[in-house]
Amino acid sequence: MSRLSKEEIGKRLLELIKDETKPAIGCTEPVAVAFTVATGKKYMTGEVLKIDLKVSKNILKNGKSVTIPNTEVCGLDIAGALGEICGDSEEGLFVFKNVNKDYLDKAKEMIKNKVVTLNPIENTDPVFVEATLKGEKDEVIAILRGGHTNIEKIIVNGTIAFEKDNKNEKDNKDCDFIKELSLKDIREITEDIGIEKLDFIMDGIEMNKEAAKEGLKREKGLTLGSSLLKLQQEGKLGKDSATIARILTAAGSDLRMGGGMCPIMTSGGSGNQGLCVILPINVVAEDIKASKEKLQRAVFFGHAVNNFVKKYTGKLSAICGCAIAAGIGATAGIAWLLGGKDKEINGAILNMLANLTGMVCDGAKGSCAIKLSTSASEAVISAYLALNDIIVPNNTGIIGNTVEDTINNLGMLCKDGFYKADDVMLSIACKEVI
């Protein structure tokens, strides 16, 4: 356990999960670009004549091929243009809520007239956007770093107009504390936290259930969820909880990646991860008729484990965080929900890591639904296997001596082993941009 008291750890963990579990409309990488531009525009006194965007390679990879809400088009340049035209920075992750056809037409005209430029930038935080807005009299530079709505600095005509006090932010959040915990610590906090503090968990469950429902009805993205449902109705797929989790998670991702306006509750700052953590746990809870309190705690545990894993792998990385980090969170929550103790919870996580480690991130797009659906299904199966004492042995391959060692191994693989792979994937996925 951390040097902090258990009470303080519980308080910080709750703050962290609340901070990283918020509703969003649309993929959070285009959102980050639009939000940065919209924030910068507030400091302009006249018309914006030019927007120069610089983004991290991870923002570029994860934002270039995903449909912007209510548009049927993709592109970070379009996202930036919409941020200038109709973005409201006060709305945070809902910055796209006002998008309509008229605004889209104006954004397309801006792109046609080369008002917006987009370039990747090397050697920066994985979540990084710099937007330079130029007018007749003003030049405003807005810099976002470390989080999808975390504005770090605003420079107006060469003078710093706003700079975030990172020291106070560190003192208040100190998110790295979670790396000092074990999975057992997180599980104990999950069981001890006052249930009245977890009302926001139910909001996320209902929100993502509705997104999955809408995804099954609407022709969005890859339409994987509705296609899987049809196969199930034809008797070609089963009606077990693993298959239902696969279908619903795919449907939610279809909607989100396909530009649906339905809000999604995020996990670790990602809507797809929110779908992958919440929906499989909820499916199992409904199957076994778990109590509302058990469901809330299981989903909270899932969010916490997802954030724990991402402290090792990074917020955006070369591996598919939705399938792996969120999938690990889901299987941990399911194993706990099914009555598993630390052995079974850890075993479910090890089963997932032995299975899906190595699934690369090739950017956010419609086919993310396939990866999410795989992870959702495997999260259910891995938990049930662990409850039946089927657990991969220690010290084999990526699997270390403990579950924490294994997650650390995953982090090493991401940061040391896959760094070059991420560059290669960027060149493949974004060749027309870079």
Swiss-Prot record:
Record-level GO BP terms: L-cysteine catabolic process to pyruvate
InterPro entries the record matches: Ser_deHydtase-like_asu (IPR005130), UPF0597 (IPR021144)
Domain of life: Bacteria
UniProt-recorded Gene Ontology molecular function terms: L-cysteine desulfhydrase activity
Family: Belongs to the UPF0597 family.
The name this protein goes by in its record: UPF0597 protein CLK_1462
